[in-house]
């Protein structure tokens, strides 16, 4: 009866007019929301530019007042030596901060990695505790780290103009340890990408080659640190977001166990998803700097400010150990074919470790495709992407996200139909689509239990071989700009260890050679699908770019992971910076 009345109402001339009005209203609403998004982008760029001008003026003013300062010498110091010289009084905290301000401003001109200057850092110099482990150290922060009075936009219009009311716990701890947070750095829109672009601040580029991605989602950090604009940065990682920028930009980074470092007060685009753990971790030019940062963060202040974090101080004995290690390794996960440079990096590192007295044992976690598709992707999008999509209402979708948002917007039945039709020819794409379906509470509990059981099964595999650590390939070199969003499957080497919640870090070990480049012409991948084709195309013109390996340990063994990374660095690190 109701349907008949509705049909009658819309079938006459008045109904047609009403329908036209509804369509016009919808179009007007869409235009209005897009206009608001354009306005938000314009305001964000203006604030970014004003902040950078303030930053430059502050650095220039200090330079005029201190013409004899040797900034090049200061900027070249490894972080531990820098801290030592500041503590001894040989260098002043002011000289360090303003030297890095000037360098960060210069790096930003070539990479667009800085979103804002945290101008209160100048006043903080007077308040920094002189006994802190990071006394006088300028620290850059991924934009999601909340700082009082500053936006954390995540590249989304809806977050522009909403400054944080207080510092997140990690920023509070950094300040209590004497560090000086001085800039926020760029991220991909919503942080669900391993590229680095958004409609508010634009594209961040790789300091090694401007046509290449710096990685993401901590891409601004990777670019700034690699080019010498920051001695230490903090990022987050839920699928490789610390490890991709570190590998693409040729620096070191570690993703700790999910709850080793506090996440309290961080800005996110999706809250409540716990099946796949987010981690907070440091990024720097060398492993010793990562260790210094973890020493500083794993302190009583953090355990007091966030009692949900296990009170586990940094274990110096494990990190300082020099005993030979039993190292599991695999050349491929059989999901993403390693590039010639990746395979060579892995094998050269393996040989160097063996020559140094370590034992290398073949090892491959079981059932990786299922872990990546059903468990990891299923966990990340257990609501079908509904909460993530809410961030994009009335906003532009950045091209760095590829087709993710369009796919998430498809009806559930259409995703299922496409997955069924694609499975015989494109199994990875079919697995990805089928994992995006929304789940009931009961099905989500089943998924979380399955992830827990998978974690225990891999630990059992690991212990059956009596392994200390594992060495794996790391996706590298850097892909072309906008390519990561079209090569979703290539996250396999990193995403697995978010699903497992194992600490994992990356260390640069070599660079792409002309021979690697020539062999890449024959790269087909294991499946020949669009993801494989994008990887093959997006890694061309890469001679000289850094290539990394990944080092993994069991949960809560960050110190052992760092010890292994330090050994790899000692044996392999090429020790170059982008020009």
From Swiss-Prot:
Q: What intervals of the chain are marked intramembrane?
A: 404-433
Q: How does its activity get regulated?
A: inhibited by trifluoromethyl ketone.
Binding-site residues for substrate, renumbered to this chain: 191, 217, 238-241
Species: Sus scrofa (Pig)
Cytoplasmic-side stretches of the chain, per the record, are 30-403, 434-579
Give its E.C. classification number: 3.5.1.99, 3.1.1.-
Protein name according to UniProt: Fatty-acid amide hydrolase 1
* Record-linked PROSITE patterns: AMIDASES
